[in-house]
Amino acid sequence: MESTPKKAPRSKFPALLVVALALVALVFVIWRVDSAPSTNDAYASADTIDVVPEVSGRIVELAVTDNQAVKQGDLLFRIDPRPYEANLAKAEASLAALDKQIMLTQRSVDAQQFGADSVNATVEKARAAAKQATDTLRRTEPLLKEGFVSAEDVDRARTAQRAAEADLNAVLLQAQSAASAVSGVDALVAQRAAVEADIALTKLHLEMTTVRAPFDGRIISLKTSVGQFASAMRPIFTLIDTRHWYVIANFRETDLKNIRSGTPATIRLMSDSGKTFEGKVDSIGYGVLPDDGGLVLGGLPKVSRSINWVRVAQRFPVKIMVDKPDPEMFRIGASAVANLEPQ
């Protein structure tokens, strides 16, 4: 009976090779994930401002629509300028009337100034006469006891002294009156400065009735129309600053050790995942609100952990500036995927 030939033992080398390659691939994936962190917990964002009128009034022109793109300097809306034009005309009329009053008063003051100079000279003369009369009376009164002068001489000295004092008081009143007339022009000049300040402020208010775009952007949340009364410092709509877009990507705290300001990044938006955008890390968040009952600090962003029943790494927001964003694709809140390439 013929014996069946034994099969040659299979080589274990291919299987070991497959296992080795799988281990190498696993190690590479782990290294890659650790050295080049990635997250799909990210969203696009940009800076925004509330567009507010700085003066109150009725909207007479609305040059934009909701979601419209605008350029810096484009007209957004215009407040009714007529009340402010009337205020400006009134202030300018007040200035013209005041200038005329100052001119007429100045002529009067010039004449009174000449009189004031004369009065000042009279004051000095009257003051000298009063002093002389007082000195004469002071010398005369002691001589009466010695009999060198008569009582009539003393009475005449006293009368002369009182008359000199009265003359001095009269010319002093004249001097005060002349001085007050001169100072009247100074008051009018000060009043003119106040009117000029009012005119400057009114012109500024008139300029503020026209509101223009402070930068390139996009209009959102527009809910008004022509005829609506706009109150000063009350928002009309929001303007997105489309010059600078960035992505807020929430990375695990274990990924932060290799992330620095300036770390290169690639961004993909969920709206078109086939298109990538280059960017760089701008900054890393230094505080988030805990979601496990810890201390809560106002103003901190809240980033939820993906698993609540297992102690997992907290996530911190990383701000990534996009180099050349597509203004038609980027929207605030759009979902994104961020990949970092630490050097």
Curated annotation (Swiss-Prot):
GO CC annotation, single: plasma membrane
Give one Pfam family.
HlyD_D23
Organism of this sequence: Shigella flexneri
What's the subunit arrangement here?
Could be part of a tripartite efflux system composed of MdtN, MdtO and MdtP.
Question: Would you tell me the protein name for this molecule?
Answer: Multidrug resistance protein MdtN
Cell inner membrane recorded as keyword:
yes
Q: Keywords on this record? A: Antibiotic resistance, Cell inner membrane, Cell membrane, Membrane, Signal-anchor, Transmembrane, Transmembrane helix, Transport
Q: SUPFAM superfamilies annotated for this entry? A: HlyD-like secretion proteins
**Which Gene3D superfamilies has this protein been placed in?**
2.40.30.170, 2.40.50.100, Helix hairpin bin (1.10.287.470)
